[in-house]
């Protein structure tokens, strides 16, 4: 904002401030309110919270609770299909389950590091494996592990989806969680495209009225797509919470371990590709990885491509941007 709170450091405490300089104390509080109002104009956080509450049909304070928000969203979805939600059962989270994959960073100083992340990883895993309370089978796969799946030691020929923790899910019906994930993701995609289009049009606006209208469109569409993004990303937090009506450790671990498979598979493929391009053997170009992101050392790649040629930072950035979009993505 380029602004800050009014200074009152000469007073020992707020009581001293209040009693010694009443007029300045009033101005201080008015300025604080104006700062909050300016922050809201710029950040739209209150508007975002209202959007989330309205969309999920919850009270405003409930948007800070993943469990309550998702419980209400699922209730509304199932009610619309004439499905009665199950009663809440008290559960204890005595057993720990595996979390996300984090690769120990390779220490060093690197030039030309790029990062990639898997788009909405956990929601997509829920859709990919049809992870949902009513699709989970009682029978577990006897030998499924992250390493065995990555090493292709297991074949999946059955009529169910198999996750890395051995949890198996029906294929003959589509679970309500994957359906909701798909709908929310599709809606987010639509409004994100509208936001980007409005931003593009804003750059070409010629009148104050047009500029104001487009600014409102950007804010509106951004709030809607951001609300959908938060809903998607908070789903796993609810699924792994023992107080969630649909909590099941198998579902939570199916998501995290399948996420490990995905990010490690991407890591292996990136290393294999760069080893082939640079004619190296078993070199590790992924210097760090965490949950759904990898950090790739493209310094050797840049050195090989620009060897003996004049180069500038701008030309390298432009080249890497194109290569990352065309080859790696």
Kindly give the residue locations of the regions a language model identified.
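Short, surface-exposed recognition loops or helix-turn segments adjacent to catalytic cores
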Residues: 8-14, 279-280
């Amino acid at each position: 904002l380029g602004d800050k709170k009014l200074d009152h450091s000469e007073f020992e405490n707020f009581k001293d401030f209040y009693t010694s300089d009443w007029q300045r104390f009033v101005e201080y509080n008015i300025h604080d309110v104006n700062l909050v109002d300016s922050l809201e104009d710029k950040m739209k956080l209150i508007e975002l919270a209202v959007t989330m509450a309205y969309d999920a049909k919850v009270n405003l304070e409930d948007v800070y609770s993943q469990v309550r928000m998702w419980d209400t969203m699922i209730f509304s979805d199932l009610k619309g299909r004439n499905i009665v939600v199950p009663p809440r059962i008290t559960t204890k989270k005595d057993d720990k389950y595996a979390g996300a994959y984090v690769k120990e960073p390779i220490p060093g100083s690197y030039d030309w590091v790029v990062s990639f992340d898997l788009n909405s990883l956990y929601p997509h895993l829920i859709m990919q494996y049809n992870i949902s309370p009513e699709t989970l089978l009682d029978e577990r796969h006897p030998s499924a592990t992250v390493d065995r799946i990555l090493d292709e030691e297991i074949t999946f020929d059955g009529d169910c989806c198999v996750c890395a923790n051995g949890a198996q899910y029906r294929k003959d019906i589509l679970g309500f969680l994957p359906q909701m994930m798909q709908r929310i993701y599709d809606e987010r995609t639509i409004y994100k495209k509208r936001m980007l289009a409005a931003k593009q049009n804003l750059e070409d606006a010629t009148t104050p009225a047009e500029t104001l209208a487009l600014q409102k469109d950007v804010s509106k569409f951004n709030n809607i797509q951001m609300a959908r993004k938060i809903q998607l990303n908070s789903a796993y937090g609810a699924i792994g919470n023992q107080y969630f009506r649909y909590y099941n450790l198998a579902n939570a671990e199916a998501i995290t371990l399948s996420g490990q498979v995905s990010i490690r598979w991407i890591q292996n493929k990136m290393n294999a590709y760069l080893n082939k391009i640079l004619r190296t053997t078993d070199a590790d170009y992924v210097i760090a990885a965490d949950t759904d992101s990898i950090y790739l050392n493209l310094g050797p790649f840049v050195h090989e491509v620009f060897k003996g040629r004049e180069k500038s930072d701008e030309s390298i950035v432009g080249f890497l941007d194109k290569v990352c979009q065309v080859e790696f993505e």
